[in-house]
Amino acid sequence: MIDDRAARAWAILFARAVVGLIFFMAGVWKVFQLGPIGHVQRYFLPFQHTFLPTWSLWAVGFAIPFVELIAGGLVIVGFQTRPALLSLGIILVIVTFGHLLDKPLYALHEHVIPRLALVLLVLLLPREWDRFAIDAIFRRSTPSDRSSPN
């Protein structure tokens, strides 16, 4: 029988693995198959006709694939989990803004909301529950510091 502490650790591992994989695999596809420039051209340059400066479309569109790849990988292994999740949350805000700029009634419930729910779940669960993370190894090897943002 699995006790409550172990069940919580497994639950957060599964949630962390799923949200990490979603973003990591999106990053893999965007970096290695589509290419960062292709990502900009396909998903960001169509917004050139808006008030957004073209340089910002290039900068954000080029960076997102790498952030998804790196932050997703960090979430999977549980290293610097909270900063990685904050990065992914920022990406979700950017993506939501872009979709709503294009279509004000965009169906957020299909893609954005499930990802946001997982990001928030893992972000808000107590760090102490996440026993199967690299962050947990560092917590065990150093004195507890409740003011740490990680």
Language-model segments: what does each one mean?
Residues 47:
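Short, helix-capping/interhelical loops that line the mouth of catalytic, cofactor-
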Residues 1-39, 50, 54-70, 77-150:
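Extended, low-polarity transmembrane helix blocks
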Residues 40-44:
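Glycine- and aromatic-enriched periplasmic loops at the membrane-periplasm interface
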